[in-house]
Every structure is written in C-alpha cells, then in structure tokens.
Regions:
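A domain-level signal for the mature, folded cores of soluble proteins
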Residues: 27-125, 131-132, 136-232
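N-terminal Sec-pathway targeting helices
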Residues: 2-19
Length: 232
C-alpha cells in the first residue's frame, strides 16, 4: 500500500512539474526580437527645445499627477525633430470599487505586481510632439482612454493625434492608468509644465523601457523607435 502511495505521489509530483514547466515555457517563450537600429534618425539632447514645447499635464484628485517629465529627441533626414515626452508617475492604482478594479489591485498593480514584472517599475507614459525643419509643431500624438469604465479590470488605449497643434499643450488625466485627454488651453492658464529632463541611459535601463526579447510577461514600454539610441 505504501509503495502504491509513493508511486502515486511521484506521478502527481511529475505531473505538476510538467504542467508548471509548460506554463513557464508558454509565459517566457520569445514573442519577438526588438530591433535597436534607428535608421534615418539622429539622437539629440536639447533641454531648451524640449522645455519650449513641453506639455502641461493636470493631475487628478484620485489618480495623482506626474512628478517628472522625461524626454528623448531625434532629428530625421528631412530636418524634422521628434520629441517623445514621458510623464513619470511613481505608481498607478485603480482606486475605484468593483470586482474588476479589486482584481486589478491584487494581480496587476499590487499583490502579484504583474505590471512591474511585465513592464518595469513606476508608470511612464508618452506624449509625442513633432516639429518641422523650421521648428513649428506639425503633429502631437498621445493615448486616451476608450469607453472608460473605472470598475473594469483594464483600460483600453485609444491612440490619438492632432495635426498642427497650438500651444499650450494642455492635458487632463481621465483614467487611473494615466491616459491623457486634450483639454482647452484655458484649463492650463497659469500652469507651468514640469521641467523637461533628458531620459538618461542609466534610467532608461533602470525602468526597463525596451527589452531585447519580448515575451508574455516581458513587454516593451511605451516609446518611439527613435528613442532606442540615446544622445551622447
């Protein structure tokens, strides 16, 4: 009887090990390799230019406000300048009631901290401004929340862009995961943008912005291809 139990126990352990191995393989298997080449772009660092076009992001009483504004910049062969601003939040959490919001707190942003495992620490978003060769803004791109439901587990991202945007670039924070909604300039009257700081290579690595190989639980963070090589 003892031998049968022992064999049964070994089979159970072996079965569990195989299942865990398959799950691990599925989770960690490579999805895609990241191409770190940035053909046609020359990285730049210009704090004054970055400050000139820095967006103003208004905080939310429940969702908080960015504490830093990081940036990377590049020029293409046409002379256009691309500025990727990264509003930086120390953390993100859905404070609302509801089963989905609760599960998010114990699985994604807290508890198991899947967000940190998948992407990296803190919450780093993206607002892009493109200038023509004469320094005039021709495009602004960002992500808003689509059909926002604060009680849901997740927030759907909706990419938006504005041609020939006019300053000041004023945004509100409509969702707990720090998406952006373009607001009337009057909302930002008297407000000053955060100091634009160059996104240094040590911090770029620290916050795991780009992964060499993406997997189910290892994903690149929001960025543009031209940011993958920093300015010296």
């Amino acid at each position: 009887m003892g031998a049968k139990l022992t064999h049964r126990g070994l089979r159970t352990i072996a079965t569990i090990a195989i299942i865990l191995g398959l799950i691990t393989f599925w989770v960690l298997r490579p999805i895609r390799e990241t191409d770190f080449a940035t053909p046609g772009f020359t990285p730049l660092k210009d704090d004054l230019l970055a400050a000139k076009f820095a967006p103003v992001v208004l905080g939310h009483e429940l969702y908080g406000a960015p504490t830093r504004l990081l940036y990377r910049m590049a020029r293409n062969t046409k002379g256009e300048v691309f500025i990727a601003y990264h509003p930086f939040y120390p953390a993100e959490e859905n404070p609302h009631k509801g089963f989905g919001a609760f599960m998010n707190r114990i699985i994604y942003t807290g508890g198991l901290h899947l967000k940190d495992i998948m992407f990296g620490p803190a919450d780093i978003e993206l607002i892009e401004v493109v200038l023509d060769k004469d320094g005039k803004p021709t495009l602004m791109a960002y992500e808003d929340a689509e059909k926002y439901n604060p009680s849901a587990f997740s927030v759907r991202h909706l990419a938006k862009s504005v041609n020939n945007p006019r300053q000041p670039f004023c945004f509100t924070t409509p969702a707990w995961n720090h998406m952006f909604a373009l607001a009337d300039a009057s909302r930002c009257a008297g407000k000053v943008a955060l100091k634009a700081e160059y996104f240094s290579e040590p911090e770029w690595v620290q916050y795991r912005m780009v992964k060499k190989t993406e997997a189910i639980l290892r994903r690149n963070r929001m960025h543009r291809v031209y940011e993958r090589i920093g300015a010296n």
